[in-house]
UniProtKB/Swiss-Prot annotation:
Cited HAMAP family: Butyrate_kinase (MF_00542)
Organism from which the protein derives: Clostridium acetobutylicum (strain ATCC 824 / DSM 792 / JCM 1419 / IAM 19013 / LMG 5710 / NBRC 13948 / NRRL B-527 / VKM B-1787 / 2291 / W)
Residues spanning the signal sequence: none
Protein name as catalogued: Butyrate kinase 1
Pathway: Lipid metabolism; butanoate metabolism
Primary enzyme class: transferase
Amino acid sequence: MYRLLIINPGSTSTKIGIYDDEKEIFEKTLRHSAEEIEKYNTIFDQFQFRKNVILDALKEANIEVSSLNAVVGRGGLLKPIVSGTYAVNQKMLEDLKVGVQGQHASNLGGIIANEIAKEINVPAYIVDPVVVDELDEVSRISGMADIPRKSIFHALNQKAVARRYAKEVGKKYEDLNLIVVHMGGGTSVGTHKDGRVIEVNNTLDGEGPFSPERSGGVPIGDLVRLCFSNKYTYEEVMKKINGKGGVVSYLNTIDFKAVVDKALEGDKKCALIYEAFTFQVAKEIGKCSTVLKGNVDAIILTGGIAYNEHVCNAIEDRVKFIAPVVRYGGEDELLALAEGGLRVLRGEEKAKEYK
């Protein structure tokens, strides 16, 4: 049996879990107030504070740090890498510290994992960060030579549910053609072939379907004109794409369940936005099916919004002619991180090296 500590830092909380193999024996969300977070100038400056909070929580739960076989952290905004479990090394720590692709709380996952693991002489890993990039070269072409397409998506959950589905049907993930749709604060639609995500929309930067707080792809000419209208700053326009775009820009709420409920009660504006969301997701699935030349084993709906039966039914109604539709509501990031660590500890795969 292997015991793992899992660390998943978010902007205002740190989720931790203790796993004995795949069994969760302890889980806690450590919430951090805005006042606490505001004391620190950079994400990295929060490192010692968050580490201490984690160690205090373990002590309170009578869990000995010395009982751990490995520590797994959420991967941050590193350089683009292929999917897998990575041993935390010096190069990774440097890139997480400076934030080579941006500052995000998830950058602390590998840093804290390494620090705790080092003290008890066990390995530290990260698994499938959002920067997983396995795009086919043809997918990188955007149509504008100085803007290549990038892969930024919900890699951890997409990979975890794809593997889960493969296990359930008794096949290898690498042998299946899948379209995986993650619907949460952002929406990512990934094309999985031969164990790689060869095509996916950039969830963070305005590609693909809109979501509760992100715009997805919008008419480019109009966006350019908006940028030069002298009405908005750079930061305000970026916020329209990520943070104040999508559902919230139309209805002033990010609660998509409430939007669906109102739509079903007859609210016409909510009904239109709800239909537009399912329409855009279905359209993106259709695009991905052409990447696989129609040879699709399954379409998987996942993420928080996939708990909503009405949303899933509406999408399935449009895409079931392509392939069977499977639903895995929510996202179990702690388990997905634990599974990644276990695959290496059991020798099922080798830990990758970050360069």
